[in-house]
Amino acid sequence: MATLQECKVKVDGEPKLSKNELKRRLKAEKKLAEKEAKQKELIEKQLSQAAAAAATNHTADNGVGVEEETLDPNQYYKIRSQAIHQLKVSGEDPYPHKFHVDISLTQFIQEYSQLQPGDHLTDITLKVAGRIHAKRASGGKLIFYDLRGEGVKLQVMANSRNYKSEEEFVRINNKLRRGDIIGVQGNPGKTKKGELSIIPYEITLLSPCLHMLPHLHFGLKDKETRYRQRYLDLILNDFVRQKFIVRAKIITYIRSFLDELGFLEIETPMMNIIPGGAVAKPFITYHNELDMNLYMRIAPELYHKMLVVGGIDRVYEIGRQFRNEGIDLTHNPEFTTCEFYMAYADYHDLMEITEKMLSGMVKSITGSYKITYHPDGPEGEAYEIDFTPPFRRISMVEELEKALGVKLPETSLFETEETRKILDDICVAKAVECPPPRTTARLLDKLVGEFLEVTCINPTFICDHPQIMSPLAKWHRSKEGLTERFELFVMKKEICNAYTELNDPMRQRQLFEEQAKAKAAGDDEAMFIDENFCTALEYGLPPTAGWGMGIDRVTMFLTDSNNIKEVLLFPAMKPEDKKETAAATETLESTTAGPSV
């Protein structure tokens, strides 16, 4: 803000400000100076109290720290850091090595919730631990804490009469603030109003929180902060914890389901000389010792099929894939999939397995085959998704012809330039965007997305893809130009992809060569030729079916999340603004470099 003196002169030929504007600015300057002086006075007072607390173990506000809550976060951090430093100087360790917990907060609540109001079990002493979310004083000798952990809350009713000594009672309660992690040794009981509590004999500070914790009443709603500081999100928002519990249940269910079918869980490389197994753009890394580029895996498929060649008939893997593509509501550069390969099976068998797995999973986790989903967020329209088997099945080309109202060329001609031109013209006529290169496979994919996928609310198998879209799938046994492949769509999004595997090494090499031509034409997502895999096929791959499912998208449906970042603990985020980062660093340095008291 310009000072009054600055306002009295012309700058770069600009006219002087009016008298009223000068008065307004002078008044604003005075108000700002008063505010800064008041804040400085408050900081000095708090620093003085912090030093006094460490020396005398007593403060005027019973240790609740109400005035501290009025400070800005940086001031609060500075005061708290110096108070903790003072504890260390006085010989006390605010970060003890160990605190033995007898019973979890959840177990405590389950075991003692039947107590009657006013009960106090003095013959039972237990140890619990958790994070303080609220602190309330009722006079000088009774302080209440809300202790949270494991998604539950337990009240701590600290009374000087029950504490090991009044001096210790004052000392510990002066130290504690919202956000601190504490250990509590005490007796189960209930207040006269019926609030289940632990009545402490001793409280131990286990790890102080140096930052001002947002109040649960207001919560943490800013999505940028929630995703960048997931630890804070988990501290304040229990619904986030519940989402990741559901995610863990999904993975556990899949693993158990496949184990019972006799599948062997395996691990395959995440860095490869050649990226393969899917049509996608890979990440490139560099290996110093080998002096060569390596690719982060986009899919584990080729390794799995080589293991089936080796005689392991049923294999599966749950792990991360990496694709150097866009970030949006349903895509993250690294994501989790489950893939399995089953010898002596075809895509019809996998449709049945998919129905059993998904319907059973939804019923097991939610208690019903039907779920409610909000694709546009909690405030948007709600859809009911029914996972009751069997799922709807449609043939891709036949259904696309119906939706477009046109007769497409015979599928045996889909690899011709004439078909590509027809599809190109249809996309133009229907205003369907397709960035170059406008290959037949890409044009088909855009048309299917625009006209078929949008009809798939309940689980729907889109089957029998053209061969030009499926370089690793086996040709259809009765429909020339098509493959025995399906994709499962739910709420317009693909969650599964599977097919009868191509096991003819000559045909596989030919398709790889066609993919190489597409890559040379500018298609970054086309596949490389993998000679090692082709050689493995020459030893004989039995009739096999392969399947892949995105864990993240399934989790989105079962947790009613419309953004993939909600179901990833640490999603990919754009870097923060450099100026903001520098300012934050400068602030941190200034608060940590201050003198100790």
UniProtKB/Swiss-Prot annotation:
Give residues where N-acetylalanine occurs: 2
Keywords, A to Z, come to: Acetylation, Aminoacyl-tRNA synthetase, ATP-binding, Cell membrane, Cytoplasm, Ligase, Membrane, Nucleotide-binding, Nucleus, Phosphoprotein, Protein biosynthesis, Secreted, Transferase
Phosphoserine: modified positions: 207, 395, 590, 596
Q: Which InterPro entries does its entry note?
A: Aa-tRNA-synt_II (IPR004364), aa-tRNA-synth_II (IPR006195), aa-tRNA-synth_II/BPL/LPL (IPR045864), Lys-tRNA-ligase_II (IPR002313), Lys-tRNA-ligase_II_bac/euk (IPR034762), Lys-tRNA-ligase_II_N (IPR044136), Lys-tRNA-synth_II_C (IPR018149), NA-bd_OB-fold (IPR012340)
Give all N6-acetyllysine modified positions. Answer: 88, 141
Q: Which domain of life is it from?
A: Eukaryota
Q: Which CDD domains match?
A: LysRS_core (cd00775), LysRS_N (cd04322)
Q: Which GO terms describe its cellular component?
A: aminoacyl-tRNA synthetase multienzyme complex; cytosol; extracellular space; mitochondrion; nucleus; plasma membrane
The membrane topology term of the UniProt record is: Peripheral membrane protein
Transmembrane segment boundaries: none
PANTHER family this protein is in? LYSINE--TRNA LIGASE, LYSYL-TRNA SYNTHETASE
What does the UniProt record say this protein does?
A: Catalyzes the specific attachment of an amino acid to its cognate tRNA in a 2 step reaction: the amino acid (AA) is first activated by ATP to form AA-AMP and then transferred to the acceptor end of the tRNA. When secreted, acts as a signaling molecule that induces immune response through the activation of monocyte/macrophages. Catalyzes the synthesis of the signaling molecule diadenosine tetraphosphate (Ap4A), and thereby mediates disruption of the complex between HINT1 and MITF and the concomitant activation of MITF transcriptional activity.
Q: What is known of its domains?
A: The N-terminal domain (1-65) is a functional tRNA-binding domain and is involved in the interaction with DARS, but has a repulsive role in the binding to EEF1A1. A central domain (208-259) is involved in homodimerization. The C-terminal domain (452-597) is not required for interaction with AIMP2.
The protein's assembly and partners:
Homodimer. Part of the multisynthetase complex (MSC), a multisubunit complex that groups tRNA ligases for Arg (RARS), Asp (DARS), Gln (QARS), Ile (IARS), Leu (LARS), Lys (KARS), Met (MARS) the bifunctional ligase for Glu and Pro (EPRS) and the auxiliary subunits AIMP1/p43, AIMP2/p38 and EEF1E1/p18. Interacts with AIMP2 (via N-terminus) and MITF. Interacts with TARSL2.
One further remark on this entry is: It is likely that the same gene provides both this cytoplasmic isoform and an additional mitochondrial isoform.
Q: Which HAMAP family match?
A: Lys_tRNA_synth_class2
Q: What is this protein called?
A: Lysine--tRNA ligase
Lineage of the species this protein comes from: Eukaryota, Metazoa, Chordata, Craniata, Vertebrata
